[in-house]
Amino acid sequence: MPAPVSRAHTSALVLFSGGQDSTTCLAQALAKYERVETIAFDYGQRHKVELQARLNVLRELKSQFPQWAAKLGEDHLLDLAVLGQVSDCSLTRDVAFKMESSGLPNTFVPGRNLLFLTLAAALAYRRDLQVLVTGVCETDFSGYPDCRDDTMKAMQLALSLGMDKRFLIETPLMWIDKADTWALAESLGGQPLVELIIEHTHTCYLGDRIHRHAWGYGCGQCPACELRARGYARYAEAA
């Protein structure tokens, strides 16, 4: 069995795509841990603009939040083109968004989060990081099976056993909706963090950085934009 994990974690590896959710998770990790590293994956996604967005977010976080800048460690970008080769979905192919006969939207990339966590754990093993932070949730999501709490618990056990190292997978957004995610960001970094998320993070499946809305950039019509817009509207109404 893996060796017992220390109760006092001091470092974490955040799966950071450059979107609203992972940026909020990164902010929480920076508020909680002494050392934080980030990891992302280039898997042949259509909206590669997110790979640039994440660099912009990291730059702005360091500039606007000096108390967090000192905690930000190395950023890692891994080439996972093989995932795009085996996936036939609207995130890796130029096809329209639709629901499949399985009941899942064709934005689902089979195995994506499982691969992400496995590779993140392998890197964390080498970097001596015991906490993996991911922005998956069961509340405002499209039914993706690899976003479920049960899946995360199973992955935590499998990775800990398979690498003989006691990993902890943190899912700060698992039980909150998009409106609460906006509110969480405000509680962590005030209005400056909310504005940073609006201006610099990317969510749109189509990679639209032309159309600016109150909640940020995007086409306003894809499932990701609609979810982000509804959450922001509820957050703004409650503010």
Curated annotation (Swiss-Prot):
Q: Which SUPFAM superfamilies match?
A: Adenine nucleotide alpha hydrolases-like
The biological processes this protein is annotated with in GO are: queuosine biosynthetic process
State the free-text cofactor note.
Binds 1 zinc ion per subunit.
Q: Which CDD domains match?
A: QueC-like
The pathway where this protein functions is: Purine metabolism; 7-cyano-7-deazaguanine biosynthesis
Quickly give the catalysed reaction: 7-carboxy-7-deazaguanine + NH4(+) + ATP = 7-cyano-7-deazaguanine + ADP + phosphate + H2O + H(+)
Keywords in alphabetical order, please. ATP-binding, Ligase, Metal-binding, Nucleotide-binding, Queuosine biosynthesis, Zinc
Q: What is its EC number?
A: 6.3.4.20
Question: Binding residues for Zn(2+), per the UniProt record?
Answer: 204, 219, 222, 225
- What cofactors does the UniProt entry give for this protein? Zn(2+)
The record ties this protein, via InterPro entries, to: QueC, Rossmann-like_a/b/a_fold
Entry GO MF terms? ATP binding; ligase activity, forming carbon-nitrogen bonds; zinc ion binding
Top enzyme class, one word, equals ligase
Q: Provide the residue positions that the database annotates as binding ATP.
A: 16-26
Kindly give the Pfam families that the UniProt entry links to this protein.
QueC (PF06508)
Family listed: Belongs to the QueC family.
Task of the protein:
Catalyzes the ATP-dependent conversion of 7-carboxy-7-deazaguanine (CDG) to 7-cyano-7-deazaguanine (preQ(0)).
Q: Which HAMAP family match?
A: QueC (MF_01633)
The protein here is known as 7-cyano-7-deazaguanine synthase
Q: Which organism is it from?
A: Polaromonas naphthalenivorans (strain CJ2)
